[in-house]
């Protein structure tokens, strides 16, 4: 009976001894390492890091998070091709310590949390674990690359869009002014044509072209008619001069004033007709 109990006790002790031996022989290693991540500006991220010391004895362990300035492009490419957690090539002298955690035991873990990341946060982050189990302190490292994408378009792109918008809106304004100028030119042409057409029409009561009156009588009648018309126009303008706006309209309607002007007043037309009928027989005799 006692022999059976001893065998049973040995059966329980053997697995425990084997487990303890495995823990003692096992090397210190990372159980969780940070991974490369790409985020947008303003996002929140977490980088895990966990380490287990060799053996079951309680040791003093320390874990630190470091931020390394952005390495050269060729080193970034090399880091992207390497295995995360096994990097030890980035040793930037401008490294900045972020946090430190120290425990007494054989396991340690610490998560790095970054909130509202910025473009300047891009770079390599390193998890350093110091193992004080032996006389000589052992240091283990695991690195991860953080890439931050811009949430908005670059400023030079916005400036280029603004310049292109200004350049595209310029011809439209020029085209509108050209249209207005062409309309004004068309109106001026129409006014000139109307004026020339009005100048060609003979005044009321004037003798038709090709009549049998001699050339001398016709010239005298024309001179007398011109003088009478000028005197009547001067008297009408001195008695009641129209406003400047109406004068401009009259000039636009009857021409620039270089040729003989004819008034549209019916009384003046009747007066001119009477003078013409009175002077025509006298000049004929």
UniProtKB/Swiss-Prot annotation:
> What is an example of a Pfam family matching this protein?
V-set
Cell compartment(s), UniProt: Membrane
Question: Got any disulfides in this one, which pairs?
Answer: 49-127
Membrane-related topology note: Single-pass type I membrane protein
Q: Which GO terms describe its cellular component?
A: membrane
Q: Which residues lie on this side of the membrane: Extracellular?
A: 29-263
Checking PROSITE patterns in the record gives: IG_LIKE
Compositional bias of kind Low complexity: 176-189, 208-225
Tell me which parts of the chain lie in the Cytoplasmic compartment. Answer: 285
Signal peptide positions on this chain? 1-28
Q: What InterPro entries does UniProt report for this protein, alphabetically? A: Ig-like_dom, Ig-like_dom_sf, Ig-like_fold, Ig_sub, Ig_V-set, IgSF_V-set/TM_domain
State if Cell division is listed as a keyword.
no
Query: Has the keyword Transmembrane been applied to this entry?
Result: yes
Q: Which keywords appear in this protein's UniProt record, sorted alphabetically?
A: Disulfide bond, Immunoglobulin domain, Membrane, Signal, Transmembrane, Transmembrane helix
* Residue intervals passing through the bilayer: 264-284
Query: Which part of the chain is the Ig-like V-type domain?
Result: 29-143
**Span list, region Disordered:** 160-225
Q: Which PANTHER family match?
A: V-SET AND TRANSMEMBRANE DOMAIN-CONTAINING PROTEIN (PTHR12207), V-SET AND TRANSMEMBRANE DOMAIN-CONTAINING PROTEIN 2B (PTHR12207:SF27)
Protein name, entry field: V-set and transmembrane domain-containing protein 2B
According to its UniProt entry, this protein's organism is Mus musculus
The upper taxonomy is: Eukaryota, Metazoa, Chordata, Craniata, Vertebrata
């Amino acid at each position: 009976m006692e022999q059976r109990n001893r065998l049973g006790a040995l059966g329980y002790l053997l697995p425990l001894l084997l487990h303890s031996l495995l823990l003692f022989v096992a090397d210190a290693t990372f159980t969780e390492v940070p991974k490369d991540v790409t985020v947008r500006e303003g996002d929140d991220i977490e980088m895990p890091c966990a380490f287990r010391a060799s053996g079951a004895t309680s040791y003093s362990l320390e874990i630190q998070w470091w931020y390394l300035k952005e390495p050269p492009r060729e080193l970034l490419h090399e880091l992207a091709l390497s295995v995360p957690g096994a990097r030890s090539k980035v040793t930037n002298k401008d490294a900045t310590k972020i946090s430190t955690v120290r425990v007494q035991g054989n396991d340690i873990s610490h998560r790095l949390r970054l909130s509202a990341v910025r473009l300047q946060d891009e770079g390599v982050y390193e998890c350093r674990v110091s193992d004080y189990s032996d006389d000589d302190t052992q240091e283990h490292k695991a690195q991860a690359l953080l890439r931050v994408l811009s949430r908005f378009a670059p400023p030079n792109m916005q400036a280029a869009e603004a310049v292109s918008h200004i350049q595209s809106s310029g011809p439209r304004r020029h085209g509108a002014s050209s249209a207005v100028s062409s309309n004004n030119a068309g109106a001026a042409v129409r006014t000139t044509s109307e004026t020339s057409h009005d100048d060609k029409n003979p005044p009321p009561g004037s003798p038709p072209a090709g009549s049998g009156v001699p050339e001398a009588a016709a010239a005298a009648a024309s001179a007398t008619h011109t003088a009478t018309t000028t005197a009547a126009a001067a008297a009408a303008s001195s008695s009641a001069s129209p406003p400047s706006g109406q004068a401009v309209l009259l000039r636009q309607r009857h021409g620039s004033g270089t040729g003989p002007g004819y008034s549209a007043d019916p009384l003046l037309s009747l007066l001119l007709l009477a003078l013409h009928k009175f002077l025509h027989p006298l000049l004929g005799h």
